[in-house]
Amino acid sequence: MRKIKRNDEVIVIAGKDKGKRGKVVKVVGENRVLVSGVNTVKKHEKPNPMKGSTGGIVEQEAPIQVSNVAIYNSATGKADRVGFKLNEDGTKVRVFKSNSEAIDA
């Protein structure tokens, strides 16, 4: 089970976008995530009439290392760490380390 999943709200804890918050759009491989509005880069795109793109300089998000983001705890308003606990029925759930609340509702 992964500590950070798609649709989690995360906060950047290191790098040029430190302090920015966003939702995880996609988990790329083992140790990278794509976060909306964070780590934007400018890509030069050729015009492609088949796709309908006009080309030019396009701004888009680039993947960021998982170690540079932390899950955002809305109850405390801070970045938090993720732990795992077993429920009564034996299923594993993710919890915040600070207040032991379940992340997956």
From Swiss-Prot:
The keyword RNA-binding applies. GO terms for molecular function: rRNA binding; structural constituent of ribosome. One of its GO terms (biological process) is translation. PROSITE patterns: RIBOSOMAL_L24. Keywords: Ribonucleoprotein, Ribosomal protein, RNA-binding, rRNA-binding. CDD domains: KOW_RPL26. It comes from the Bacteria. InterPro entries: KOW (IPR005824), Rib_uL2_dom2 (IPR014722), Ribosomal_uL24 (IPR003256), Ribosomal_uL24_CS (IPR005825), Ribosomal_uL24_KOW (IPR041988), Translation_prot_SH3-like_sf (IPR008991). GO terms for cellular component: ribonucleoprotein complex; ribosome. It holds the Pfam family ribosomal_L24. SUPFAM superfamilies: Translation proteins SH3-like domain. Belongs to the universal ribosomal protein uL24 family. PANTHER family: MITOCHONDRIAL RIBOSOMAL PROTEIN L24 (PTHR12903). NCBIfam families: rplX_bact. One of two assembly initiator proteins, it binds directly to the 5'-end of the 23S rRNA, where it nucleates assembly of the 50S subunit. Part of the 50S ribosomal subunit. This is Large ribosomal subunit protein uL24. It comes from Marinomonas sp. (strain MWYL1).
